[in-house]
Design a protein with these regions (language model features):
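Conserved phosphate-binding elements of NTP-dependent enzyme cores
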Residues: 1-839
Length: 839
């Protein structure tokens, strides 16, 4: 970036980091320019996020919060001080995390982007309101804004117009039937009697058995229903009693399950539908809800039609439509509609309407620049992809027009098609133009090439990383011989990691054929997935990739494998030979520090048994269970096996420190005395706490004589996870690391009956890591598996056997299969947006 003015020697133009030791950082000293776009690159586990989030963001946010009063700080969750000697000149910091939290059931695109605030205000202030006395519409006026009553021209009655909060489905405007969720759960009658060849006595009405209402069989017989004939032979009248019979008392003779005792009981009849409804009301925990859920089906609320709004909230009209109809529009459509609102109002109302509309348009402008114009305002927040949620978060930050803030972004290119990269860079440039600084952790070479300054961490992952390999301008880093990202930035190197299947041989192993009706933005379509191949599903944001794969293909395959009915929108599925579908996502593994790499992959069980067989363990009476740091006798009594203790410092955030007694090993002193003889080693080897402190690669030689443990660790090494420590807590792993760890149990076994589905597995991966990942997928394919990947990474797509490209645009402009074939065939298709970047 060119500087138009001479540099002021007294002006602070960089952040100074000295002695950073967060996670695997090795006393890193680095200067980060202020007022510039700074990219942080490096292989997975090299320390990128540790530097950006663990040091820069942690210190920037902590120091800002320290300026607040102690009373205020007590009410704010605070991060502890980073493990760093000194950080100077760091501004107040905001972080846009790699994976924003999945919103709750009440969140929509409109609420999370705050667009609905302006829209509700518009309908409240300038809408034509409904008279509650006669139902007539009252022409728009300034009375609502002036807090004056409205006068109905039809009946002359006065009433108060609704405020913006009374039009919100999260408060006063919620539909009373569904509570503002838009969804109603009804009993699925087909699930109540899945096998009509059985009689009621044989358990045809499964709900009476599984929900502990076995007596209902006898009561049903007392109601006049034949219980000893197949259900399919019952008359319509008998079926009506089973499903909808009245709650009448009947006298029955009940035989105890044990013994020959009989008892006479007067029992009220609960028909099959009421049994489910009653159990749903009484369900107090997740287990109870799960037991009932299989008899329920979710659908749009019958009263509000899925709009979430009450009848009163749907009353006000603007330009002839109500609030529910306005939220059903896409953002593109809503902006065009909003532009015409002021001119249709009386002259005295136009300035107020123009102000509200401008507020809406300014919020929408950033979202449109980030390629989200295809989303409807009522789109459920939980159905948004990770990339969509992150871009909504980014748009909110930019809209605030702050200055002097350090924005730290973790993988801002998540979910972003190459066609949307320019919009993202434009937003980051706007932040800098407002006087802010941006530090972004990313792997996309197009994003990194646009940075003013690059910092590359490495050279390897874990203990082999944590140092600054190269830094400077893009050209400087590209020319640095030590840089691993340099050859990819300069175009001298491309990702090529696997042999691809020839087009003529693509369907030699069979195919999965899928036909579906419309869902969300996806139109009716049919698609063929070649079995035993690596398949990439591509397309711009909102083109329907997630809907096709995660909401159609995966549930359809799961239902077929379980022998259950296909989802309602799936018209046909031919997946002969497929009995398993594995969705491998990047959600964190476990929620607390007790879950570690060793426990998740199962190697700790093998190690505990091995140490329990030693002479020292036998003499002390230790069993395998005693070597568990969760429940065993050998766990540290001070930290209870967590490896950490929390210090309560009043007015300051709790400080988690390594347990001083076990030094974070999780084991008590006695465990260190149990050592195991190792193959080819003189004397005794390591204790279990010492072994757990090693990386996977370091531990492999120490378990050479333990076949099961060795194979599990070798698999982790082959997955590119050899740098992980056995005792490392799994919630701290990155999304890519979590995905590969979940695959560990699947490697090395036949997979011809399996389909593996991945949603953007290259998130956070350096081009070298992408090569490793492609090698992992090739192993699955070699074992017979079909691997389906939703992906934007062009290097990955170019290495796929088959590409299904959705589009051509997002939202209403997409939703169909534009092209399918080999990467070369898709690149040759003029309608394919992805193809333009593959060519």
């Amino acid at each position: 970036m060119e500087k138009s003015q001479a540099k002021d020697p007294d002006r602070i133009d960089h952040i100074e980091v000295r002695g950073a030791r967060v996670h695997n950082l090795k006393n890193v000293n680095v200067d980060i320019p202020l007022g510039e776009l700074v990219g942080v690159a490096g292989v997975s586990g090299s320390g990128k996020s540790s530097l950006a989030l663990g040091v820069l963001y942690a210190e920037g946010s902590r120091r800002y919060l320290e300026a607040l009063s102690t009373y205020t700080r007590r009410r704010i969750s605070q991060a502890g001080k980073a493990a760093v000697d000194d950080v100077r000149y760091v501004p107040a910091a905001l972080a846009l995390h790699q994976r924003p939290a999945v919103p709750g059931v009440r969140s929509t695109f409109g609420t999370s982007s705050e667009l609905l605030n302006s829209l509700r205000l518009l309908f409240s202030r300038v809408g034509s309101h409904v008279c509650p006395h006669c139902g007539a519409h009252v022409p728009p006026s300034l009375n609502v804004a002036a807090e004056l009553p409205l006068v109905c021209p039809a009946c002359g009655q006065k009433f108060r117009g609704p405020g913006a909060e009374e039009l919100a489905f999260n408060s006063g405007g919620a539909c009373p039937t569904c509570g503002g969720t838009g969804v109603a759960r009804t009993v699925n009658r087909a699930a109540l009697v899945p096998d009509e060849s059985k009689s009621i006595d044989e358990g045809a009405v499964v709900v009476w058995g599984s929900l502990m209402w076995d007596l209902m069989k006898q009561v049903c017989g007392a109601m006049g229903v034949r219980t000893n004939v197949p259900f399919c032979e019952l008359t319509p009248e008998e079926r009506a009693i089973v499903f909808d019979g009245p709650a009448e008392k009947r006298h029955i003779l009940y035989k105890a399950k044990k013994g020959d005792n009989f008892a006479e009981l007067d029992f009220t009849y609960f028909n099959a539908v009421r049994t489910v409804e009653n159990s749903l009301v009484k369900a107090k925990d997740e287990k109870g809800l799960k037991r009932v859920a299989k008899f329920l089906v979710e659908g749009p609320c019958p009263d509000c039609g899925g709009t979430r709004l009450s009848a009163a909230a749907r009353g006000p009209l603007v330009r002839g439509i109500n609030l529910a109809e306005a939220t059903q529009m896409t953002l593109d459509e809503a902006c065009a509609w909003m532009a015409g609102v002021p001119e249709g109002l009386p002259a005295e109302m136009r300035p107020m309407a123009a102000s509200i509309c401008e507020s809406f348009q300014s919020t929408a402008r950033r979202l449109l620049e980030l390629g989200l114009g295809y989303l409807s305002l009522d789109r459920a927040g939980s159905t948004l992809s990770t990339g969509e949620r992150q871009r909504v978060q980014l748009a909110r930050s930019v809209r605030n027009r702050t200055t002097g803030v350090l924005y730290v972004m973790d993988e801002p290119s998540i979910g972003l098609h190459p066609a949307n990269v320019d919009g993202l860079l434009g937003v980051m440039r706007d932040l800098i133009a407002d006087g802010n600084s941006v530090v972004m952790v990313d792997h996309d070479t197009r994003i990194l090439a646009a940075a003013d300054h690059l910092v590359e961490m490495g050279p390897a992952a874990g203990a082999g990383g944590g140092t600054v390999v190269a830094q400077g301008g893009v050209d400087e880093v590209a020319a640095c011989p030590e840089s691993l990202i340099g050859p990819y930035l300069s175009g001298k190197k491309r990702v090529e990691a696997r042999p691809r299947t020839a087009a003529d041989d693509m369907f030699d192993l069979g195919r999965i054929h899928l036909e579906s009706s419309g869902l969300h933005t996806v139109r009716p379509l049919c698609a063929d997935v070649p079995k035993g191949r690596l398949v990439a599903v591509t397309g711009v944001s909102g083109s329907g990739k997630t809907t096709l794969v995660l909401e159609t293909l995966v549930p359809a395959l799961a239902a077929a494998a379980a022998g259950e009915p296909l989802p309602a929108h799936v018209m046909a599925l031919d997946a002969a030979g497929v009995s398993r579908v594995n969705l491998v996502d990047a959600t964190p593994i476990g929620t607390n520090v007790r879950s570690t790499v060793a426990t998740y992959c199962g190697v700790l069980d093998d190690l505990r048994r091995a140490y329990a067989r030693t002479d020292a363990a036998r003499e002390a009476g230790y069993k395998a269970g005693d070597f568990s740091y969760n429940t065993g006798r050998l766990r540290c009594p001070i930290c209870d096996g967590t490896g950490q203790i929390s210090l309560d410092v009043q007015f300051l955030p709790d400080v988690d420190i390594d347990c001083p007694d076990c030094r974070a090993s999780r084991y008590g002193a006695a465990a260190a005395g149990v050592r195991r003889a190792e193959k080819g080693a003189d004397g005794l080897g390591l204790s279990l706490p010492e072994l757990m402190a090693l990386s996977v690669d370091e531990a492999l030689p120490h378990v050479a004589d333990l076949k099961r443990a060795r194979e599990k660790l070798q698999t982790l090494h082959d997955l590119g996870l050899g740098y992980l420590t056995l005792g490392e807590a799994t919630p701290a792993l990155s999304g890519g690391e979590a995905q590969r760890l979940k695959l560990a149990s699947e490697m090395g076994r036949g997979q011809a009956d399996a389909v593996f589905v991945f949603d953007e597995p290259t998130i956070g991966l350096h081009p070298r890591d992408v090569e490793t990942l492609l090698g992992v997928f090739q192993r699955l394919v070699d074992q017979g598996a079909t691997v389906v990947v939703v992906e934007h990474d062009l290097d990955f797509i170019a290495n796929a056997d088959w590409v299904i490209d959705m589009g051509p645009g997002g939202g209403e402009a997409g939703g169909r299969v534009v092209a399918c074939g080999t990467p070369e065939q898709v690149a040759a298709c003029p309608q394919s947006v992805t193809g333009r970047y593959l060519g």
